[in-house]
């Protein structure tokens, strides 16, 4: 085979390989880039996970997840509300109020945000701001029994007893088995020295829920006339909730 033929064969093989390579698909690495819709969905799932962790008492983990959800989607008021709840669970009340503020900027007509804000202010003993928030929320959603109850408690603290009764009665009319509101009606009657009405309210609350609070309240109410029965009831209440031994705890329960 002469040199010319060998050169031609070599050129043919090179060209053929080049043509084959040109037909081979390139291997390009694939990166998943989520769109806005997918990001929103992921953030809501993370937020849901953060909310569920609160029920298991995993407050720090809940806070981390809630912050992650917000870092992905800061335009959802529900995620800000979840973050606020996680912050409250970690005693970060000022930060929680800022989160509620962010949520209200996104959706100022969401009543739950004002109710949550009111609850946070109550934890901070800021009665004035708590009342403003609760009243604003009730303008939007007037039949929220928990908000009515909390507003009644504020009036009770302020010794505006008739106003307190009105709020408790509104809540009870909506939710007849709302024993906490019935119990606090009894507290109002007790403060007004209407002992018979107070006893009736406490007994009604106990019939719905044998909680330590109305049992102890009943014990105090009947103490002057039925001392032995009062002692029995007081012991029963303290067995159910020993925290009532603490004067600070009783004060927190509006005693």
Task: Go through each PLM region and give its residues.
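Structural signature of tandem alpha-helical TPR/SEL1-like repeats
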Residues: 55-64, 89-102, 123-136, 157-170, ...
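Canonical tetratricopeptide repeat
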Residues: 82, 116, 150, 184, ...
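Residue-level recognition of tetratricopeptide repeat
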Residues: 51, 85, 119, 153, ...
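N-terminal leader/linker segments that initiate helical-solenoid repeat arrays
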Residues: 2-73, 78
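Structural marker of alpha-solenoid helical repeat scaffolds
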Residues: 72, 106, 140, 174, ...
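TPR/TPR-like (Sel1-like) alpha-helical repeat modules
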Residues: 203-246
